[in-house]
Amino acid sequence: MDGGYSWLSLAQGVFNTQVNRWDRSSCNGGLRWQIYAYQAGYELKNTISNGGLFQLSARLARYTNNHTYSDWAERIWDWMASTPLMENTTWNVADSTQVGDSCTSQGNNQWSYNYGTMLSGAAYMYAHVCLSSSPLALETN
């Protein structure tokens, strides 16, 4: 990249920006779909926003072996599994949930890109944890 920055520093900058948007004030966490209250999607938390951060965290964990990133990937996965966004018995991945009802309902739409984002992030976490030669990774499997 020009300007003395690396792709890694760009990815880390995006990660830092996104985790600062983690919204603990509603639904016990998660990213809102849009960032400004006047936008129609502000009242939604959706899979692509949270799944994108999950995937980025998992990829950074794999690339850097920094536990901050793997901790965030686990936090995002666990949060999504605690909401209607990701049903961890049927593996239904919903598009969105409403902040107004404390994220207890889901939008009926399912999109393949949401599944792809979650599968990719899960694959990076698998590679980070299970394919690592570090003793810590072997102990946690």
Predicted regions and their residues:
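Glycan-recognition and catalytic cores of secretory/periplasmic carbohydrate-active enzymes
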Residues: 1-141
